Structure formats: structure tokens, C-alpha cells
């Protein structure tokens, strides 16, 4: 429950399609705007994913998925590598999707991906309906996450030829000016 109905609907897509339980309660400054609420939920969810995966021993690590939603086709590719990098190649034709500014969706994913310390590329190949475009992004992300976090019983160690997944730069939240 974030206080933003369309955003709650999108978060439900992550829970449903990644097969992860999400319980989110955010009491943000919605009287000002939705930006901080959406960004903070992304930061908190990304941090929770990173902590839940620990050293990532045994996970599949790499994943991709394509999702169709009527006329829309979206793909997501991710690597749970501890090196945050985000590409958002998604175009909508309206300033708002649901009750949200369209730019908030990339802000959400950027925050989540930074704190989860993953590399993630989300791209809509085509589509006309703005609701379908955004929802297919959330579903495609969720399916990729489900695959990437799946434990592979053949992998006994950390999924890296180096034997570790290190990232030594601090999170942008940890930066002190």
C-alpha cells in the first residue's frame, strides 16, 4: 500500500510473476508529489532483494524474458552481479500512465536496480497502449528476476568464474558530500 493505486497494481505484478511475497507500506509525501514515494519504494525493495540474496551462492544469476501484452512486446535482461547499471528504453505517448507521471517508472527501476546491485536492461520493442507498455515492463522484470534468483542445484558456489561478486563502490545513498 503506497497510496498510489496504479503503482500498487504494478508492484503486484512483481510479486505475482517473480513469485516473491511483497508487503509494502509507504506513507509518503503524496501531497507534494509522487516522486519521493516511488523512489523510496524502489530503494527499499532493491535493498531488500540484495539482502535476501546474501552472497548469491547457487543462484542462476543471469536471466532474460519477453512479455507480450496485447500489442506490446517488452524484454528485460538482467545480471545479479553486484555492479548496478540500468538501461530504460521505453517510450510512452502520454505524460501520465494511470495517475503517475511516466518518468516515475524509470525512477522506480533505477532506484531498485541500484540498491539491488544488479545490471538490468528494460526495453519495449513496440506497443501503443501506455498501460500495456508499463505493465509489460513490470511483468518482464518480474519474470527475469524469478529466473535469476532461482537456485540451480548444480551450482554449489557463487556464480562467478572469479569466485566472488564484489562491488566496492558505495551506494549513492552512502555518498557523503
Q: Predicted segment positions?
A:
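Structural preference for solvent-exposed beta-strand-turn elements
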Residues: 1-166
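Short, cationic motifs built from Arg/Lys/His that form the positively charged side of catalytic pockets
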Residues: 150, 173-174
Amino acid at each position: 500500500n503506497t497510496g498510489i493505486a496504479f503503482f500498487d497494481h504494478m508492484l503486484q505484478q512483481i510479486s505475482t510473476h517473480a513469485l516473491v511475497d511483497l508487503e509494502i507500506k509507504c506513507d509518503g509525501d503524496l501531497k507534494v508529489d509522487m516522486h519521493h514515494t516511488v523512489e523510496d519504494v524502489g530503494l527499499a525493495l532493491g535493498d531488500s532483494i540484495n539482502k535476501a540474496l546474501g552472497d548469491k551462492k547457487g543462484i542462476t544469476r543471469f536471466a532474460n524474458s519477453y512479455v507480450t501484452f496485447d500489442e506490446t512486446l517488452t524484454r528485460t535482461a538482467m545480471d545479479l552481479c553486484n555492479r548496478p547499471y540500468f538501461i530504460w528504453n521505453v517510450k510512452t505517448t502520454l505524460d501520465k500512465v494511470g495517475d503517475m507521471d511516466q518518468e516515475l517508472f524509470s525512477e522506480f527501476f533505477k532506484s531498485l536496480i541500484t540498491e539491488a546491485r544488479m545490471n538490468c536492461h528494460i526495453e519495449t520493442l513496440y506497443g501503443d497502449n501506455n498501460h500495456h507498455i508499463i505493465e509489460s515492463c513490470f511483468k518482464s522484470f518480474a519474470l527475469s528476476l524469478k529466473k535469476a534468483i532461482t537456485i540451480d542445484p548444480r551450482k554449489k558456489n557463487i556464480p562467478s568464474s572469479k569466485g566472488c561478486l564484489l562491488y566496492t563502490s558505495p551506494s549513492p545513498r552512502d555518498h557523503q558530500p
